Amino acid sequence: MAANEDRDDAAAILNWEGTSEIKSANEYSRNLLFSVLDSLDGNKTIVWDRDRSVMHRVNLFAGASVLAAHGVVANHSIETKKSASTPHVVFFLAPTMVSLDLLCDYIDNVRNDSKILYQVFFIPEAWFVVRESLKTRAEGKYWERLESVKEIPLCWLPRDGECLSLSSPQIAARLLINGDWTHLHKCAVALNQLIDMCRGRSSSSNQRPMSIYAKGKWASDVAKMMGKIRNSAEADSMTKNLDPIEGLLKINRIVLIDRWMDPLTPMLSQLTFYGLLDEIYGIGMVNSVKVPEMEFKNEKDGDPFQEKEVYLIDEVYHRLKHSHINAVSIEASKVLAEIRDDEQFDRDKMSVAEYSVLVKKMPKIINRKKMIEVHMRLAEMIQSHVYCKQSDSIKLERDLLEYSDSDKAIPLIEDLIFDASPLNAVLRLISVHSLTCGGLKPSVLQHYRRIVNQSYGSSALNKVLKMQKMGLIREKGGGGKMQCEYAQMMFQQMKKNHDMLPEEFSEAKLDDMAYAYSGFSPLLCKMLEEGDRVKWVGWPKTVIGDKSDLIAERDGRGTCVFVIGGLTRSELAIIRENLPNVALITTSALITGDKLLNNITNI
């Protein structure tokens, strides 16, 4: 957790903590956590799950020093089986059977005083199956040892200071391959928590309204579930236990939209600075990337496996992240000019008061110089990767967006397969080929399948079949078991209707909807822009709360967007820069094409 404190210090110096909406949501989550800890009198020992995502999730809201201020005097890993001497042992666990096994093993093997109270908290939710298994295991032996079994619904995780994510990248695959609709219910529960952040929970039946607009099959289902949850006995029980934070988030409406209205964009190469960071290195839960240290330091000798972790939480990163990789130097030059201006001072003519101001400014100046150097090095590494390894693929993507033929295989895709290039890169291009032409001719699809099987093996072929089931690859006139239940995108028609390939665009202008993909405007973003322009007329609407009071509807601002199935960082940048009425962007996960495909492997 020391690293978490270092990140907190850096953020404080550079003064970038996110938008006011993100701060409000974070404050709500912190208070959920603190209310749990403060309800337990005396000192506490936290026993952390082996699944480090639980610790990472909690550390996004509170580091070691903050937890200590709420009575946490020791932190143990559940696998070390260390004994505790505090009145309470608090288990922070993921809601999985593996975590349940570790809990039972801890109870069996750790000889704590019988007076010590065991408090179990599943994060972010306590799944019914896990709870019931715990109750019945060993005829209730373990259940009886526990003082309480609850959940801490830390559902919404901050991303890049401008987005909230459920960190569930598997949702699209689970829905389309398994038909597991429980994931939509989890989205509905989380969105109801978002409403609580805005309106607060009250036992009064006269609640301020919240309008929900939905676009797509999943969105419509989630909107219905939200209403049912709100009106059910579950909602009634929630109003009896008010959350510690009420009404801080200023949102007037929630707009739900399916990722699968536009499955094409995640398959394309992102070209914004932080979009490419995510594509190439992967931005983790704690908003950091791990890069090869030798490459970062531009050294020829060293450990090729050594990695450097770079935290993306500072004000300089915030200034650069939305920029197109070809235009990132423009914004960087502005930051450098500001640093030079800050360093312009005449020591001989400065008063004591001016020296005092300078001393206070120096840490920020030094840190800004350090961070601009770090981020420009990352930009150099990204540009080198794009030009050396991705330029041909990016050009092919552009060609397919302009014109795509379903009757023949693409030579570049064939060459990449024969060269055993990274599988996901190949599959993404096949998907782009299929989606842009409205489905591949059966002979072309069979040819792709055959050569993929020859070069990568049966596991890769299985992945292709799952992509068919998800609708990422389609066969013209195809049906049967491989037919995707979700309606086809109809790219050629949508391209004309929404002007997705404008004749003129600028990579340097962030208010150009085509800048992030070098001339391509994502359909999902265009749909949101159109909806915002017409004030969501024509989008199915559900009102939660008192329907007689819709004063907030008159104000076009304060819109919250929730994308079910994932959102790319480049799309996030487009929405932030082009839709000023959108105050908060939320999603089931921030994704890349690779992350989307990786989540179908184990299904």
From Swiss-Prot:
Among the Pfam families in the record, one is Sec1
Q: Which GO terms describe its biological process?
A: intracellular protein transport; vacuole fusion, non-autophagic; vesicle-mediated transport
Concerning InterPro entries, the annotation shows: Sec-1-like_dom1, Sec-1-like_dom3a, Sec1-like, Sec1-like_dom2, Sec1-like_sf, VPS33_dom3b
Q: Which GO terms describe its cellular component?
A: apical plasma membrane; CORVET complex; early endosome; HOPS complex; late endosome; lysosome
Q: How does it sit in the membrane?
A: Peripheral membrane protein
- Which body tissues produce this protein? Ubiquitously expressed at high levels in somatic tissues including the pharynx, muscles, hypodermis, neurons, coelomocytes and spermatheca. Expressed in the intestine.
Compartments annotated for it: namely: Lysosome; Early endosome; Late endosome; Apical cell membrane
- The main location is other
Assembly and interaction partners: Probable component of the homotypic fusion and vacuole protein sorting (HOPS) complex consisting of the core class C Vps proteins vps-11, vps-16, vps-18, and which further associates with vps-33.1, vps-39 and vps-41. Interacts with spe-39.
Q: Which family does it belong to?
A: Belongs to the STXBP/unc-18/SEC1 family.
**What name does this protein carry?**
Vacuolar protein sorting-associated protein 33A
Organism from which the protein derives: Caenorhabditis elegans
